[in-house]
Amino acid sequence: MKILVAVKRVVDYAVKIRVKPDKTGVETQNVKMSMNPFCEIALEEALRIKEAGFAKEVIAVSIGPSQCVDTLRTGLAMGADRGIHVETNSIFLPLTIAKILKSLADVENPGLIFLGKQAIDDDCNQTGQMVAALLGWPQATFASKVVLDKDKNVATVDREVDGGLETLNVDLPAVITTDLRLNQPRYASLPNIMKAKSKPIKKMTVQDLKVDIKSDIEILEVTEPPKRKSGVMVSSVDELIDKLKNEAHVV
């Protein structure tokens, strides 16, 4: 069985986000970029499944500019067998990304597709669900535990929901999106970083995959959240009640 893992290049989580002066997006020039943390978890889970003998190959896929090769090399250093880079300088919304992944799945015929539940740059939480719908495959989102039954060709997935956990059985092939509690991603060792340089990365274009990139959604503007007034320290409960009553008028 092959496992296809989508990995996204995003602004590093430790970087303070700045909006471009023209408000067309966030500034990505001269800032640290890294693999989306949820994608790292997805890749780690795929690697563990392979190491347990349930899969023969893990393929990392990234869609974006030429710099996405660095993200793929990180994935290869973690243990992925090969990479696919769909190169584009356009910024695609989730449905277009899902169409591209669907086309790649048609070519690669994986038994599982793993994605992070969302990317930390846009927080859309849509791509995995859309990929499953386009393929007509079952899906399990927000996975916090994944157990495969090779004989029954079924994945049992614990998923986090409001107020608890839900357990699903999904027939393979399936799409699974990963939550934070699923695992702790490994660090790439120096020998594996060196080995990753010789692992293959196949370059493709949207045109190669014959994907319709037309979108019915247009991003009009990206703005920073409004600045909030700083909080006020009070010295006693009586003073707090007084301010809530006479200044905030909430009691």
Curated annotation (Swiss-Prot):
GO biological process annotation, one example: L-leucine catabolic process
Keyword Aminoacyl-tRNA synthetase: no
Bound cofactor: record note: Binds 1 FAD per dimer. Binds 1 AMP per subunit.
Location(s), subcellular: Mitochondrion matrix
Keyword annotations: Electron transport, FAD, Flavoprotein, Mitochondrion, Transit peptide, Transport
InterPro entries per record: ET-Flavoprotein_bsu_CS (IPR000049), ETF_a/b_N (IPR014730), ETF_b (IPR012255), ETF_beta_N (IPR033948), Rossmann-like_a/b/a_fold (IPR014729)
Tree of life domain: Eukaryota
Cofactor names: FAD; AMP
Induction: Expressed constitutively. Not induced by dark treatment or sucrose starvation.
UniProt keyword annotation of Mitochondrion present: yes
Gene Ontology cellular component list: mitochondrial matrix; mitochondrion; plastid
Matching CDD domains: ETF_beta (cd01714)
Description of the deletion phenotype: Reduced plant viability on extended exposure to darkness and a reduced reproductive performance under normal growth conditions.
GO molecular function: electron transfer activity
Chief site of localization: mitochondrion
Assembly, per entry: Heterodimer of an alpha and a beta subunit.
Family as reported in the entry's similarity comment: Belongs to the ETF beta-subunit/FixA family.
Known function: The electron transfer flavoprotein serves as a specific electron acceptor for several dehydrogenases, including five acyl-CoA dehydrogenases, glutaryl-CoA and sarcosine dehydrogenase. It transfers the electrons to the main mitochondrial respiratory chain via ETF-ubiquinone oxidoreductase (ETF dehydrogenase). Involved in leucine catabolism and in phytol degradation.
Name of the featured protein: Electron transfer flavoprotein subunit beta, mitochondrial
Record organism: Arabidopsis thaliana
